[in-house]
């Protein structure tokens, strides 16, 4: 008795860090057909678009989310436990687990000063920050704009806007993706665009418009040219099987079902109908 067909499983090549396909006898089950990772990710994107409707409806009826990120309390914007970036710990809450100052290729992180103590043991948020240049900085608005937007520097006991007093950290030195200062001295792009981890950016308002964008995480913006790790392989090349791929008109049959499909070699436009298989 012939064994039933199994999913088309991509094989990981540890020597080269690439994926290779496995041959299967799909004649055993005529309504089964597998796909490469290109089709898999396209189907996943369709599912995400479908879920956006319910996700948006849920957000608009929740009182704690139906407003701007700028109105959230600091406790609501804490980093998830699995993120690589950890904020500087509160010296009053307990022993330090990481340094308060993290040095990067772009200068020192704004780690923050010690909170002000109040009667009864309460504390206030840090009133100012230090860059390591002997001056104090503070932000006078609660927004997610990058440094030095809406930042003040203390000079001779007076708080003045950074953009007016320090051209080095002004228009030519700001970084649109980070709240950290960017120095203007020459450095390789791989260092200039390196990030410590996830950050909350953007306006973040929940509105019935697809033009509202909030950057909650940062990922590499350059295509991967080198090999991948076994973890990346397991996340990007899962076993995939599609049921009844021939249930529609064959003129809409997607080339992505073929393990040999390469988008660069496909000259015909792909319509939305090719993604509507059940």
UniProtKB/Swiss-Prot annotation:
Residues 114-199 form a propeptide. All late proteins expressed from the major late promoter are produced by alternative splicing and alternative polyadenylation of the same gene giving rise to non-overlapping ORFs. A leader sequence is present in the N-terminus of all these mRNAs and is recognized by the viral shutoff protein to provide expression although conventional translation via ribosome scanning from the cap has been shut off in the host cell. The keyword Phosphoprotein applies. HAMAP family: ADV_CAP8. Pfam families: Adeno_PVIII. GO terms for molecular function: hexon binding. The gene is L4. Induction: Expressed in the late phase of the viral replicative cycle. The record marks 113-114, 199-200 as: Cleavage. Keywords: Capsid protein, Host nucleus, Late protein, Phosphoprotein, Virion. GO terms for cellular component: host cell nucleus; viral capsid. The keyword Aminoacyl-tRNA synthetase does not apply. Cleaved by the viral protease during virion maturation. May cause the middle segment to be shed from the capsid. Belongs to the adenoviridae hexon-linking protein family. This is Pre-hexon-linking protein VIII.
